[in-house]
Regions:
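Short loop/helix-cap segments at secondary-structure boundaries that form the rim of catalytic
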Residues: 1-2, 95-103, 183-191
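Rossmann-like dinucleotide-binding domain for NAD(H)/NADP(H)
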Residues: 8, 144-234
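Short gly/ser/thr-rich secondary-structure transition/capping motifs
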Residues: 44-53, 98-106, 126-132, 152-155, ...
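An N-terminal-biased, well-structured beta-alpha scaffold segment characteristic
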Residues: 1-8, 114, 134
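Short beta->alpha connector loops at strand-helix junctions that form conserved
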Residues: 4-16, 93
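Rossmann-like dinucleotide/phosphate-binding beta-alpha-beta segment
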Residues: 52-143
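Phosphate-binding beta-alpha-beta segment of Rossmann-like dinucleotide-binding domains, i.e.
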Residues: 12-65
Length: 234
């Protein structure tokens, strides 16, 4: 800024794709889609005495409490999808009650972890949020709780989460981000019970990547025209 250099960013290009991934993980866990598909291919449905077959709990999302940690673009889009599923939506956010739609209730962080059936992380990584999900907060959660992280890997203490999953302290986790990417072979989440990991692809739909490139081009053209947009160092 002191040297007159304009810095721009590319905002909100992957909002829909990341919110979609939250529910890809959540629906996979709720219905155990991957597991049951694998069991069908092994012949277990063929050998079932009944017209249907399942061997895990099947979870209905309607009426469940989802807690969103952070309510920016992606958090808000996730909230809207959750509302369409008939879920109760709570958020830990700097926004005031007056800034929230009536369907979203504000909650303090520890209360959110204790009261919600699903917790989804949407906050930036700062020194204050680093490893905010740790043994203490995991101990607050319900034994049937689900944790989703499409934000930043270091928001979670991975050993503490693995311990909570392996001990049955919480039911399941779906994560698209890890503290180190690609992960080391000894990352404890790779062998944790009911831990579903995708390789940082929430942002990477074709539509999102096309949008990213288009906004970058728009930023450049606007700068060349003397009317810069998406400036972050005004």
């Amino acid at each position: 800024k002191e040297r007159g250099i304009i810095v721009t960013n590319i905002p909100a290009y992957s909002t829909d794709s990341v919110a979609q991934m939250v529910f890809a993980h959540l629906l996979n866990i709720a219905q155990q889609v991957q597991h049951h598909s694998e069991e069908v291919h092994k012949g277990r449905w063929t050998n079932s005495p009944d017209f249907c077959f399942w061997d895990t709990p099947l979870i209905e999302l309607a009426g469940k409490k989802i807690g969103l940690v952070g309510l920016g673009n992606t958090g808000m889009r996730t909230a809207r999808i959750a509302i369409s599923f008939g879920m109760e939506v709570y958020a830990f956010t700097s926004k005031s009650h007056f800034q929230l739609p009536p369907e979203i209730k504000k909650m303090e962080l520890d209360e959110l972890f204790a009261e919600c059936d699903i917790v989804s992380l949407h906050c930036p990584l700062t020194e204050q949020t680093r490893e905010m999900v740790n043994a203490r907060r995991l101990s607050l959660m319900k034994p049937n709780a689900i944790l989703i992280n499409t934000g930043r890997g270091p928001l979670i203490n991975e050993q503490d989460l693995a311990d909570a999953l392996n001990s049955g302290r919480i039911y399941a986790a779906g994560v698209d981000v890890l503290s180190q990417e690609p992960p080391r072979a000894y990352n404890p989440l790779l062998t944790a019970r009911n831990c579903y990991i995708t390789p940082h692809i929430a942002w990477a739909s074709t539509a999102a990547r096309q949008r990213l490139m288009q906004i970058a081009l728009d930023n450049l053209k606007a700068y060349q025209a003397g009317n810069p947009i998406n400036v972050v160092n005004k």
